[in-house]
From Swiss-Prot:
This is Large ribosomal subunit protein bL28A. Belongs to the bacterial ribosomal protein bL28 family. One of its GO terms (biological process) is translation. It comes from Mycobacterium bovis (strain ATCC BAA-935 / AF2122/97). It comes from the Bacteria. Keywords: Ribonucleoprotein, Ribosomal protein.
Length: 94
């Protein structure tokens, strides 16, 4: 499974770890991806979304209406906006 948040689009970060002697080794910073279930009262069902900790905060803060407005305005990630008719998008924009 890919390490990508379905809400924010956050993905793996790359860089280098620098030791005390300034040796640099490549490393990666994976996002904090959680599998979260949300209940959709309009469809009377639960769906599962792979979302980062920041994405959970976004859903808690904005709710489904705020996330829907962001997707329409173009501030949502491209993969999120393409799924306009899918149930995944419906779930992600609680």
């Amino acid at each position: 499974m890919s390490a990508r948040c379905q809400i924010t689009g956050r993905t793996v970060g790359f860089g280098k770890a620098v030791s005390h002697s300034h040796r640099r080794t490549r490393r990666r910073w994976p996002p904090n991806i959680q599998l979260k279930a949300y209940y959709l009262p309009s469809e009377d069902r639960r769906i599962k979304v792979r979302v980062s900790a920041q994405g959970i905060k976004v859903i808690d803060r904005d709710g489904h209406r705020g996330r829907r407005r962001a997707a329409r305005a173009g501030s949502a990630p491209a993969h999120f906006a393409r799924q306009a008719g899918s149930s995944l998008r419906t779930a992600a924009i609680l």
